[in-house]
Amino acid sequence: MQGFKQHTGLVVPLDAANVDTDAIIPKQFLQKVSRLGFGKHLFHDWRFLDDAGEQPNPEFVMNHARYQGASILLARENFGCGSSREHAPWALADYGIRAMIAPSFADIFYSNSINNQMVPVRLTEQEVDELFQYVQATEGAQIEVDLEALKVRANDKEYSFGIDDFRRHCLLNGLDHIGLTLQHEDKIAAFEADIPAFLR
């Protein structure tokens, strides 16, 4: 998996609190276990006026021309609440989101996002307010998320954020659960070599 060190991208401001996983990816699209293809269904009930997803809702922020190609999502508190479906971060990642910034995230969604190589950045409500004001007032506004320095940079300002060392290590090095296991491949091989033949 691709590691995440720094990323600068266009920002889409989703000015809503308590956005749940059913809004992020509605239940009717949870019929497969591949991570790919969910981006087109992201926020389906908000992005589209019809069930088939053929009539974009012109009022929904992600359909505005100025936010097309956004790779950073700016949101309000408790983003990703609701059921623990991993399809929610799959949909965001498949859409092209690399990082999310909010005052808080639901715990399971936070972990699932990191497992899918997206960086969920927690800032204070005041700092998030400042970023909303900047992004909404500035067409083409970009934000830099620097995981190495644990900084967010925007509009000539710098904000600090935290993440535990283990999760940061995984994100920086592009490690999922399989990748973490393979880091100990030599120890696994040595253990297997010591197993008696009749147990193999």
UniProtKB/Swiss-Prot annotation:
Pathway: Amino-acid biosynthesis; L-leucine biosynthesis; L-leucine from 3-methyl-2-oxobutanoate: step 2/4
GO cellular component terms, semicolon-separated: 3-isopropylmalate dehydratase complex
Keywords, ordered alphabetically: Amino-acid biosynthesis, Branched-chain amino acid biosynthesis, Leucine biosynthesis, Lyase
Gene3D superfamilies named in the record: Aconitase, domain 4 (3.20.19.10)
Gene Ontology MF terms in the entry: 3-isopropylmalate dehydratase activity
Organism domain of life: Bacteria
Reactions catalysed: (2R,3S)-3-isopropylmalate = (2S)-2-isopropylmalate
Assembly with partners or alone: Heterodimer of LeuC and LeuD.
Job of this protein: Catalyzes the isomerization between 2-isopropylmalate and 3-isopropylmalate, via the formation of 2-isopropylmaleate.
Protein family per UniProt: Belongs to the LeuD family. LeuD type 1 subfamily.
Record-given protein name: 3-isopropylmalate dehydratase small subunit
Organism: Vibrio vulnificus (strain CMCP6)
Top-level taxonomy: Bacteria, Pseudomonadati, Pseudomonadota, Gammaproteobacteria, Vibrionales
Gene this chain is encoded by: leuD
